[in-house]
Amino acid sequence: MTKQYERKAKGGNLLSAFELYQRNTDNMPGLGEMLVDEWFETCRDYIQDGHVDESGTFRPDNAFYLRRLTLKDFRRFSLLEIKFEEDLTVIIGNNGKGKTSILYAIAKTLSWFVANILKEGGSGQRLSELTDIKNDAENRYADVSSTFFFGKGLKSVPIRLSRSALGTAERRDSEVKPARDLADIWRVINEAKTINLPTFALYNVERSQPFNRNTKDNAGRREERFDAYSQALGGAGRFDHFVEWYIYLHKRTISDISSSIKELEQQVNDLQRSVDGGMVSVKSLLEQMKLKLSEASERNDAAVSSKMVTESVQKSIVEKSICSVVPSISKIWVEMTTGSDLVKVTNDGHDVTIDQLSDGQRVFLSLVADLARRMVMLNPLLENPLEGRGIVLIDEIELHLHPKWQQEVILNLRSVFPNIQFIITTHSPIVLSTIEKRCIREFDPNDDGNQSFLDSPDMQTKGSENAQILEQVMNVHPTPPGIAESHWLGDFELLLLDNSGELDNQSQELYDKIKTHFGIDSAELKKADSLIRINKMKNKINKIRAEKGK
């Protein structure tokens, strides 16, 4: 069996290499130090290795991403199958089609990776027999089946979450061992020697909840690396969470020397006053305390300097990501001169407090900042931690965003977080106009939920006009059919055809209505004038042909 593992490991199989590392570590502590090191480095290199592409961006040699999802009797779906792109997948469909349910199915699956990175045998989110099983499910259970890809040495990581309905005699267990096996590798290798870890996050529409800042002082709280996974898949990205964390980080980077040094300073000051008051007997003690204070300060400066650099860089990266992605913001900082902690930004050249930003800016800022914070904590070995890998789910990416910002949102996210697999939902044709059709997954408009296969649209969306995308991809007419004014131009064209291109009283009246309603510089009036010219030209040509035929 060992030979078989060795053959697979040398062929690039990650699970086999890790099995050999574990065997040599657990069962042959004396023998296999070299073997242990060999298989450990094989695993670590598989996870860590990467290259810099032509644009100067770090790319992992072994990408990790969700490849396929199948839902069976999950919520509204009898059966749904969807394939994902490695970099970006955008899901579109009418309200109630189940876009958000797809994101929650993925989030529940990802939670099993997170739970087992944090501790051996951890349990992730389970399906609910109350809310996740289709009401009329024939088999009385729900399945969420996922397949992940992690490089050529681990092409398929299949996971299935299952749940039987209440009162069902037969139990249906989930199959999560592959998730635990992979998470074990990340956890064990990281424990032996720090590695970069994947980021997983869900940003749901609740991120738009009103700003409710907690004003208590959190400067003394302790920030651990694995806090990056805290609440990551529960709809992260609340604005008040970011403000609290950012003020904490700011205070950490400018914090005073430790309390022990403050005590030494107080003792030195007290002794100095005694000596100055004539107590010569404590002069030698004063010199000893001064020396102790000097040595303690030097040690503290060295330790604090190292930690402050880390936190200072962390803060700088988050600030840079915000200014790169969030529209109109060029600077962000903490203002403390007023006696209270205020996060301020330069917005379109004006300094304002962060709670004075628009809803769209606040919502998007908190998402970007939250994601950047998590990636900085999980990727300490990367020169740019935002080039770490991971899977990020965003519901309604266009939430509160101005149309101009919708044109930039995905482009900016992909630029700042180049190795994240984004899985996104949207209702915005503007967003769709910025991405290739290969990245879009649409529901069949006639789908009744019994059997769904999400696929790419026929039309190329990137660079296309919004009106085309609305009509050909989203099956929505660019102008509302229930609005009478939207039909005037078509009615006008029909009148011209009926009257051989001439304006009679009825067509003239309709022309005047178009001119008055839409305005003299409107595209609608220009189209009406163009129709008149074209029909006059056709009429003239027809007359010439008629005369030649006599």
Curated annotation (Swiss-Prot):
A motif (ATP-binding) lies at residues 93-100. It comes from the Bacteria. One of its GO terms (biological process) is DNA synthesis involved in DNA repair. GO terms for molecular function: ATP binding; ATP hydrolysis activity. It holds the Pfam family AAA_21. InterPro entries: ATPase_AAA_core (IPR003959), P-loop_NTPase (IPR027417), Retron_ATPase (IPR053498). NCBIfam families: PtuA (NF041760). Probable ATPase component of antiviral defense system retron Ec78, composed of a non-coding RNA (ncRNA), a reverse transcriptase (RT), this protein and a putative HNH endonuclease. Expression of retron Ec78 confers protection against bacteriophage T5. At multiplicity of infection (MOI) of 0.02 cultures slow growth when infected with T5 but do not collapse, at MOI 2 cultures enter growth stasis. This is Retron Ec78 probable ATPase.
